[in-house]
Design a protein with these regions (language model features):
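Dual-mode signal for accessory low-complexity, basic/Gly-rich regions
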Residues: 265, 278, 294-359, 375
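Bacterial Sec-dependent N-terminal signal peptides
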Residues: 1-21
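A short, compositionally biased
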Residues: 203-209, 279-281, 367-373
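Short, solvent-exposed amphipathic alpha-helical segments in soluble enzyme
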Residues: 64-69, 227-229, 238-239, 284-286, ...
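Oxyanion-binding "anion nests"
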Residues: 247-295
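Active-site bordering "gate/hinge" segments
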Residues: 17-265
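Intrinsically disordered terminal and processing segments
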Residues: 347-390
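Short, glycine-/Ser/Thr-/acidic-enriched flexible segments
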Residues: 55-56, 119-121, 164, 217, ...
Length: 390
């Protein structure tokens, strides 16, 4: 769940796949310089929190050195699958509700956070009761609220595509193909992303109703009048505290916003939905007046329902829309590549929409990727059968 900006300095709850960047043949020093200078725009005397997986230690060190070369101060922490799991299996459950004093103090101190996606085991925490996630998210809420009101910049490398054997297997594509796609997207011309994003944003702000249809049975509409789209183009924008423009997701290439609350109606169908390491087939979600009213699937969804039922009521609210605009990311024929940024993909979400400057303050969020749809603003198509029009 990339979009819920939850600060787990020692323990990322929602784990994504990870590959050593060194094995991908990447110029780590050049990448570190770009992240520090272009994406995060690190200035003298900043305090920069850097975190990632132990297998990416060389990249993390290069980032830290480049931060210091700018006269700023790096604080580096690392994690691993082993640590993530043991923090649940060996730490007593009674501490799930404990406010992290350390996290509060770090948020007060830092000016920028740079994260490299960590984790390498799908379903690593699949056997952990959902109530434990709920308890930890609630305990984390004061930290998140403080983070939201701050002016902390954030750069995250991964964005659901970090190339690994596990993730490539999940997408049913060769890891070399996924790796090339990932790094091509990282290295694309970000000015082009800005141009594409601005054109799409103009179309969105000129209309009143967004409608999404798909041959799989999806037929959903939501009001978007007076909404403010944000462009994720790989650069931190000059923004006020709490502004969505201070978040950078790499590879970049998204336009996202919070729609009008209480206006989503219709059905969203996902041919496949990956949840906690398991694939749910034919997931059908029904929305009425902005709230999720039912979910069913062709395969077992008890794990998903148990997780959903354990959350607060705000998770039921349809709360964000995210368009993929990166033309360097294409969905290969026959693959199951589902993520935010391929041009022509649309992601719809429920629950916390902090990342889009929304008002939903749920302790959780869920997002659903849909490729191959047709999307219109009033009567003007912005996506036609999965192809972004720009």
């Amino acid at each position: 769940m990339k979009k819920l900006i939850v600060i787990f300095f020692l323990l990322p709850l929602f784990v994504q796949a990870q590959l050593s960047t060194k094995s991908a043949g990447t110029d780590l020093e050049a990448l570190a310089k770009n992240i520090v200078n272009q994406c995060a725009d690190i200035q003298e005397n900043e305090i920069v929190f850097i975190n990632g997986d132990t297998r990416d230690i060389e990249l993390l060190e290069d980032i830290a050195v480049n931060v210091r070369k700018n006269g700023a101060f790096p604080l580096l922490t690392v994690s691993s699958d082993r640590l993530t799991r043991k923090m649940f299996t060996e730490v007593p459950e009674k501490y799930d509700t404990q406010l992290s004093i350390l996290n509060m103090e770090v948020v007060k101190m830092m000016t920028t956070q740079i994260s490299v996606t960590s984790g390498d085991t799908p379903g690593l925490l699949a056997d952990i009761p959902p109530e434990r996630f709920v308890a930890r998210n609630k305990a984390q809420k004061p930290v998140n609220d403080l983070y939201r009101e701050s002016s902390i910049k954030s750069v995250q490398l991964g964005n659901g595509l970090y190339p690994t054997k596990n993730r490539a297997a999940q997408f049913e594509m060769p890891v070399d193909q996924l790796s090339k796609m990932f790094w091509d997207a990282i290295n694309m011309d970000y000015n082009k992303l800005t141009t594409i994003g601005e054109k799409l944003s103009k179309n969105l702000t000129s209309g009143n109703t967004l409608k999404i249809v798909h041959d799989n049975g999806t037929n959903l509409s939501v009001k978007i009048a007076d909404c403010t789209p944000y462009i994720s183009d790989g650069k931190v924008s000059a923004d006020k505290p709490g502004g969505a423009g201070r978040f950078v997701y790499l590879p970049a290439g998204e336009v996202f916003f919070a729609p009008v609350a209480g206006t989503a109606n219709g059905t969203l169908v996902l041919d496949q939905f990956l949840f906690r390491g398991k694939t749910i087939k034919g997931l059908k979600l029904v929305f009425e007046d902005g709230k999720l009213t039912s979910m069913e699937a062709k395969s077992d969804i008890e794990t998903l329902k148990d997780y959903y039922d354990a959350q607060d009521d705000l998770l039921a609210e349809f709360s964000f829309v995210d368009f993929g605009i990166n033309p360097k990311i294409t969905v290969p024929e026959g693959s199951k590549l589902y993520t935010y940024i391929p041009a022509g993909t649309i992601t719809l979400g429920i629950g916390n929409n902090f990342f889009a400057n929304g008002d939903n303050n749920s302790n959780a969020s869920m997002d659903f990727h849909l490729a191959g749809s047709t999307v219109t603003v009033d009567n003007t198509a912005v996506i036609e059968k999965g192809k972004l029009i720009y």
